[in-house]
Amino acid sequence: MDRLLLVLLSSASLLLTVYGIKHHIVTKSWSEAQSDCLQYLRVESPGRYLSHRYRDNQTSKQLIFCIILNLRIYDPTQNVLRLKAMGQFFNPDKTDTLYVNRTNACLLRVKVPPLVDSSEDSQLYSGVMGTLYEVFRCFYHCYGNINAIAPKLPPTVLELEKIQQECARMVGVSERLLDGGLQLSSHPRYSKLPRCIMLRSGGSVDYLTHRNNSSRRFKLKKNVENDTL
């Protein structure tokens, strides 16, 4: 029993250390996300993937799909891909001035399937997997080499909404006021809310502006420099 308690306390201490630094969102590098997915999918002979060699087969497509989900680049519930975020996982050559044009030309050839293109569980997301694999190939072959470090990404719309709800509870703002938008600015605890959101999201966030634009979504558009509507 004492040993179990010690293990639990050690685990809690580790979690506090991690979240004390990151507060809420932990962004991984491509290699870290890939390492996770190789374990999730129980991929045999992962050597080729560790050296970033991805053949055009189902295993590679499943792996890329898992990595992109793990990195929060794609939201399957909304069928939304953040192309600008995707680009941050690749480093273009400093002397290359045409990488954006090449990548956009490649993306123009990528077909966007419906969210679910089959009623059979075994084929769930198969079309999306193929699309995301082709998008990955556009970035990998046209944009730049895979980034070795974890880039700083802004939270997704759904993540930011969750952070705002959590922070409202922490600082004592009711759900009614949270949905009140501009009325929040006169609340005595409002000044604490933006700071909590900033710390947990990892950056400066204009709360009221976000609430007024909460219906905005990222889409798979044919321009890697601006993927917001």
Swiss-Prot record:
Q: Which UniProt keywords apply?
A: Disulfide bond, Olfaction, Secreted, Sensory transduction, Signal, Transport
Q: Where in or outside the cell?
A: Secreted
From the UniProt record, which GO molecular function terms apply? Answer: odorant binding
According to the UniProt record, one GO cellular component term is: extracellular space
The record's SUPFAM superfamilies line, in alphabetical order, gives:
Insect pheromone/odorant-binding proteins
Q: Which cysteines are joined by disulfide bonds?
A: C66-C106
- Mainly resides where? secreted
- Asked if Metal-binding is a keyword of the record, the answer is no
GO annotation, biological process? sensory perception of smell
Q: Which residues form the signal peptide?
A: 1-20
- Transmembrane intervals: none
**Superkingdom of source:** Eukaryota
In UniProt terms, what function does this protein have? Present in the aqueous fluid surrounding olfactory sensory dendrites and are thought to aid in the capture and transport of hydrophobic odorants into and through this fluid.
Q: Which family does it belong to?
A: Belongs to the PBP/GOBP family.
Protein name as catalogued: General odorant-binding protein 69
Gene from which this protein is expressed: Obp69
